[in-house]
Amino acid sequence: MGLIVDTSIIIALERGKISTKAWSNYDQAYINPIVLTELLIGIDRVKDENKRGQCLTFIEYVKSLFTLLPFGIEEAYVYAKIIDNLYKERITIGVHDLLIAATAITYNYPILTLNTKDFKRIPELEVLTVPLKD
């Protein structure tokens, strides 16, 4: 069974707060283009060239760890359905999180995140988390 990994987990990995063992019980761990985009946005904010180089190296490492799932037509339909359902309930969640959730729901994979507060409000989404190291 697969697993979608959220950006919060990857940031915790970069900071040494979790290890890759966090998803080792799953056959395959995936990210979607939105997770990659969020990481790239962070790089654009880094002004120090050495730090920027380290960030780019880390992103290459992330790309080697995970399979990148596409965000296509089916995911777009699921995304629209999620937004409609949340709108009816007057629930607001960030667009990026909803796009990541749509990918997880489309593939029927749980999502591994540290942002359980938002993701648990999305129906049909199985949300998993891990404890952080000190």
From Swiss-Prot:
Q: Keywords of this protein's UniProt record, alphabetized?
A: Hydrolase, Magnesium, Metal-binding, Nuclease, Toxin-antitoxin system
Residue ranges of domain PINc in the record? 4-124
**What InterPro entries does its record include?**
PIN-like_dom_sf, PIN_dom, Type_II_TA_system_RNase
Name the Gene3D superfamilies for this protein.
5'-nuclease
Task: Please give the Pfam families that the UniProt record associates with this protein.
Answer: PIN (PF01850)
Q: Kindly list the positions annotated as binding Mg(2+).
A: D6
The EC number(s) given in the record are 3.1.-.-
Of which family is this protein a member?
Belongs to the PINc/VapC protein family.
- Which PANTHER family does its entry note? RIBONUCLEASE VAPC2 (PTHR33653:SF1)
Q: What is this protein called?
A: Ribonuclease VapC
The primary gene name is: vapC
